[in-house]
Regions:
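Key DNA-contacting residues within the recognition helix of helix-turn-helix
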Residues: 24, 49-50, 59, 67
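Short alpha-helical DNA-recognition segment
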Residues: 31-50
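N-terminal flexible/basic segments that precede or flank functional cores
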Residues: 1-17, 66, 71-81
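DNA major-groove recognition helix of helix-turn-helix
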Residues: 52, 62, 70
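Non-catalytic, surface-exposed connector residues within folded enzymatic/regulatory domains
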Residues: 17, 59-60
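Residue-level signal for the short linker/turn that defines the boundary of a DNA-recognition helix
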Residues: 18-21, 31-32
Length: 81
């Protein structure tokens, strides 16, 4: 099972917006199932599914983790300038 390394670093002031398509794109970029991705984020698989369906959006600590994971993996988010 792949593991992700999260390093502490200062995030850019511009806030990324994680919509359904971006969450799914990051997960696919990492080659993870919803369950694997959920385990790394410390959320339920159902939560990842709901994010990817647009029922809910990530917020708070989940957004911070998504930003760190995306940065560490070299994922290009559309909000990055």
């Amino acid at each position: 099972m792949p593991t992700l390394t999260v390093r502490r670093r200062t995030l850019p002031k511009a806030k990324r917006h994680w919509d359904a398509a971006q969450v799914k794109a990051l997960r696919a970029f990492l080659g993870m199932t919803q369950q694997m991705f959920a385990n790394e984020l410390g959320v339920r698989q159902q939560t990842v599914s709901e994010w990817e369906k647009g029922i809910y959006r990530p917020r708070g600590a989940s957004v911070t983790l998504l930003n760190q994971i995306a940065d560490n993996a070299g994922f290009k988010h559309p909000d990055d300038k």
